[in-house]
A protein has these predicted regions:
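Short metal-binding segments enriched for Cys and/or His
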Residues: 11, 66-81
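Non-catalytic localization and substrate-recognition regions of ubiquitin/SUMO ligases
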Residues: 22-29, 59, 75-80
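Short cysteine-rich clusters marking metal-coordination/redox-active sites
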Residues: 42-46
Length: 81
């Protein structure tokens, strides 16, 4: 059966796995900024955040350290906690 949201699930699982294995940092004292995509690669799943998508920037002390799709941010945040 076709699942129209399967790509979001794949992104989520890929990001969750990368946090669990230490490929993505665990951060303390971060802020989140949400924007329309800048067309850069998502640090979570490795796919480009498309022009029509929202991009979450994770900021630590004024430096953007992660750029993530919304579903990738959720995966990172769940494992981070």
């Amino acid at each position: 059966m076709y699942d129209p949201t399967a790509w979001k699930t794949r992104r989520y699982e890929r990001t969750k796995r990368r946090v669990s294995t230490g490929e993505l940092p665990r951060l303390v004292g971060f802020r989140i900024w949400s924007w329309v995509s800048t067309g850069r690669m998502c640090d979570g799943c490795g796919e480009v955040v498309g022009a029509a998508e929202i991009q979450h920037d994770v900021d630590v002390d004024g430096t953007i350290v992660l750029r993530l799709h919304p579903e990738c941010f959720r995966a990172w945040y769940v494992v981070e906690r």
